[in-house]
UniProtKB/Swiss-Prot annotation:
The keyword Glycosyltransferase does not apply. Homodimer. It comes from Clostridium kluyveri (strain ATCC 8527 / DSM 555 / NBRC 12016 / NCIMB 10680 / K1). This is Beta-ketoacyl-[acyl-carrier-protein] synthase III. Catalyzes the condensation reaction of fatty acid synthesis by the addition to an acyl acceptor of two carbons from malonyl-ACP. Catalyzes the first condensation reaction which initiates fatty acid synthesis and may therefore play a role in governing the total rate of fatty acid production. Possesses both acetoacetyl-ACP synthase and acetyl transacylase activities. Its substrate specificity determines the biosynthesis of branched-chain and/or straight-chain of fatty acids. GO terms for biological process: fatty acid biosynthetic process; secondary metabolite biosynthetic process. PANTHER family: 3-OXOACYL-[ACYL-CARRIER-PROTEIN] SYNTHASE 3, BETA-KETOACYL-[ACYL-CARRIER-PROTEIN] SYNTHASE III. The gene is fabH. Pathway: Lipid metabolism; fatty acid biosynthesis. CDD domains: KAS_III. GO terms for cellular component: cytoplasm. The keyword Aminoacyl-tRNA synthetase does not apply. NCBIfam families: fabH, PRK09352.1. It holds the Pfam family ACP_syn_III. Belongs to the thiolase-like superfamily. FabH family.
Length: 323
């Protein structure tokens, strides 16, 4: 079985910062209320950039990090719930933008677990020998599917993109993988598509925004975060003490805090940047992982856990060996 290396990482967030004070001007909320309940201080909002554009910029940064050319890429997988179009896929648009002439391209929809799923898919293709170089991307323009009068959701999300280059190599980056789904709780986090009965009715389109049962999602997220950490460690017979960082989906500080208490681990073991970006869904763990590498917070031989969970409901994680 072929070994899989994480050859490069890249991310991109739009320059426009929308902080909590800005939000207080458009919805009934304030900075203290948001920070106390979520840990979020600000988020990035796209101004004219669509998902494919941000995905392209993250991809270019990952390619530079990996020192590869676009024509080397065999597969592009884009995880997103906010594509530019139904057709063509965001992955095909990225292919055109970066001129990856040899790549097979497709999108996947797994919400906040999306990049985990994409990395899992890419890893399996490389291990099987089908492809040698895979570009996995998580990218979202969540600002376009939010109800900006609903303070229970609009305060949580931001826009951004993250990318990783996986390639066949001499060392193993992906020590273990874990994914799962719970469609039985899917109604806890939804965003309707075009209505079947009358797709031309403007009022129906206005209903295509995110709605969330916050309590149900919170309970699910804490449970799954703890479960995923334990399962990934058990598979490789690794202890929490051997983990340099746990990089969780950046949804809510309280979720991470509760999970840390259950796992009996210091909160500092978790890498957290949600205060700056909010919940960027599929891009979340990738932006954080890229930061950890760029800041030189890890070195060769360190082990890192990344855990995703979100709409679907979906979840998953990876145990990464830094090479």
């Amino acid at each position: 079985m072929n070994k899989v290396e994480i050859a490069g990482l890249g991310s991109y967030v739009p320059p426009k910062i929308l902080d909590n004070n800005d939000l207080s001007l458009i919805v009934d909320t304030n900075d203290e209320w948001i920070r106390c309940r979520t840990g979020i201080r600000q988020r990035r909002i796209s101004q004219g950039e669509n998902t494919s554009e941000m995905a392209t910029k993250a991809a270019i940064n990952a390619m530079k990090s990996a020192n590869i050319k676009a024509e080397d890429i065999d597969l592009i997988v884009v995880a997103t719930i906010t594509p530019d179009n139904f057709i063509p896929s965001t992955a095909c648009i990225v292919q055109k933008n970066i001129k990856a002439v040899n790549a097979t391209c497709f999108d996947i929809s797994a919400a906040c677990s999306g990049l985990i799923y994409g990395l899992d898919i890419g890893t399996q293709f490389i291990r099987s020998g089908r492809f040698k170089v895979v570009l996995a991307i998580g990218a979202e323009t969540l600002s376009k599917i939010l109800n900006w009068q609903d303070r229970s959701t609009c305060i949580l999300f931001g826009d951004g993109a993250a990318a990783a280059i996986l390639q066949m190599g001499e060392e193993e980056s992906i020590l273990s993988m874990y994914t799962g789904s719970d469609g039985f709780q899917g109604d806890a986090l939804t965003c309707p598509a075009v209505p079947v009965n009358n797709p031309c009715t403007t009022s129906d389109f206005q209903k295509s925004v995110v709605t969330m049962d916050g309590k149900a999602i919170f309970k699910f997220a804490v449970k799954i975060l703890v479960k995923s950490v334990k399962m990934l460690l058990k598979e490789q017979e690794v202890t929490l003490e051997e983990i340099k960082y746990i990089i969780p989906h950046q949804a809510n500080y309280r979720i991470i805090e509760c999970a840390a208490k259950i796992l009996k681990v210091d909160i500092d073991k978790f890498y957290i940047n949600l205060d700056l970006y909010g919940n960027t869904s599929a891009a979340s763990v990738g932006i954080a992982l890229d930061e950890v590498y760029k800041k030189n917070l890890v070195e060769k031989g360190d082990k890192v856990l990344i855990i995703g969970f979100g709409g679907g409901l979906t979840y998953g994680g990876l145990l990464i060996n830094v090479i």
